[in-house]
């Protein structure tokens, strides 16, 4: 852009912000209940607001081109398609979850707990920064972050920390199971307390490595999980979860603030740290508008389906450095945020991505229709999967890309087990019960 944004640019970005406010009002017009869909739409309103701010920042607007109407329209349609399962559940909320009667669901939770506690000694001894250092040393967060970036640049070809891999792969699904267990009448309180501690560890460990992104992702996952099951939790459990959530947010906020200051305080231009924070939160909508639909080529699934492609084609890039080098002809890469929609558009093109979104979410809508006033756990898992994609990727990129394709595999296995187990119960009621 090189200069202040034009009136048209501001009309478009403000219009995009207002359409999400209108969507939020429409979403709650008939049914006032706040749920997971409310959280996702609310986050999109926030991101659009910060897009307005960073677009008009005299330091950052030189990074942007002038905005166009069609990309914003396309982005809105794609995000609404991705949200369609949550919207359907909002207006067709069953009052009861059918219990799958499976003790097997404890297995991934136990694996998460074990892997979480195995990581603690390594994280503490191997970290460049302790929690105290992050708060007191202005350079500690930056040093830890640079160390992690160096490690990631060489990652993708081998497993260096098996407990961390297991933990990260299981985190989203076990968060889902944690909130489901809270809805049951007979609760193992000690088990739930230990599982909660393991989930909280998932927010602490990235802080020690100077990472904000992983903490934010974990927090958004917890918010989605709680909001999805909130309707089925007792008033007392809701209160306890809300108090625990506020406490977690306070504990995490201090080191995250310190990391942010450490990362951006030495950079010139803009309004200090705040300008970089606004750019960090608000850039995705603008970069999507500028380049995601017309980047000068596509990546053929090398990011969104990276691990699956590597099983078939050995020349598939193993990490983001290799991928950026391979597709250096594109106008934009994954150094910048373009939302999860942008990731798919860059991988497959806007037309193919539309059909991928439409067909997948149509299948989900067909599958999640509740019957007899109850909803099954595998149906809720599908909705949770789509919500995590929407919530985690609304500000950044597709969160299940690269080696995180393994998380999709875990989702599939859990979904298949829940469906198979229920079918077995119907066919052999006594043999299937655990």
Regions inferred by a protein language model and the residue ranges of each:
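Small-residue-enriched transmembrane helix-hairpin modules in multi-pass membrane proteins
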Residues: 3-8, 138-161, 251-365
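Membrane-embedded catalytic interface detector for glycan/lipid assembly enzymes
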Residues: 2-11, 91-232, 254-263
């Amino acid at each position: 852009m090189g200069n202040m944004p034009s009136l048209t640019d501001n009309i478009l970005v403000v219009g995009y912000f207002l359409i999400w406010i209108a969507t939020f009002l429409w979403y709650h017009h008939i049914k006032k209940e706040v749920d997971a869909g409310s959280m996702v739409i609310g986050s999109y309103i926030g991101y659009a607001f910060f897009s307005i701010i960073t677009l008009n920042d005299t330091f950052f607007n030189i990074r942007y081109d002038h905005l166009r109407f069609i990309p914003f329209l396309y982005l809105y349609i794609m995000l609404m398609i991705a949200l369609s399962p949550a919207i359907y559940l909002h207006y067709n909320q069953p009052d009861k979850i059918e219990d799958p009667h499976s003790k097997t669901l404890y297995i991934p939770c136990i694996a998460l707990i074990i892997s979480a506690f195995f990581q603690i000694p390594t994280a503490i001894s191997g970290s460049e920064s302790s929690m105290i250092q992050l708060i007191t040393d202005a350079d500690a967060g930056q040093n830890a972050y640079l160390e992690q970036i160096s490690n990631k640049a060489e990652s993708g070809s081998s497993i260096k920390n098996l407990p961390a891999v297991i933990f990260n792969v299981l985190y989203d699904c076990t968060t889902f199971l944690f909130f489901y267990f809270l809805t049951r009448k007979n609760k193992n309180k000690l088990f739930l307390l230990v599982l909660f501690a393991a989930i909280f560890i998932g927010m602490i460990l990235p802080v020690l490595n100077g990472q904000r992104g992983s903490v934010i992702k974990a927090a958004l996952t917890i918010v989605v999980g709680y909001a999805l099951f909130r309707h089925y939790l007792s008033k007392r459990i809701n209160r306890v979860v809300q108090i625990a959530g506020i406490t977690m947010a306070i504990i995490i906020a201090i080191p995250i603030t310190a990391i942010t200051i450490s990362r951006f305080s030495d950079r010139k231009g803009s309004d200090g740290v705040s300008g970089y924070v606004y750019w960090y939160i608000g850039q995705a909508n603008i970069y999507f508008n500028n380049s995601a639909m017309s980047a000068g080529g596509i990546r053929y699934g090398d990011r969104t389906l990276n691990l699956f492609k590597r099983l078939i084609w050995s020349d598939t890039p193993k990490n983001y450095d290799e991928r950026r080098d391979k597709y250096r002809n594109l106008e934009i890469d994954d150094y910048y945020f373009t939302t999860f929609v942008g990731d798919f558009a860059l991988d497959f093109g806007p037309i193919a991505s539309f059909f991928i979104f439409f067909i997948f979410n149509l299948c989900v809508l067909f599958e999640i229709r509740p019957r007899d006033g109850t909803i099954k756990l595998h149906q809720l898992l599908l909705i949770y999967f789509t919500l995590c994609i929407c919530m985690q990727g609304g500000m950044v990129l597709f969160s299940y890309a690269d080696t995180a394709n393994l998380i999709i595999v875990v989702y599939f296995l859990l979904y298949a087990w829940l469906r198979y187990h229920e079918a077995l119960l119907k066919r052999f009621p006594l043999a299937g019960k655990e």
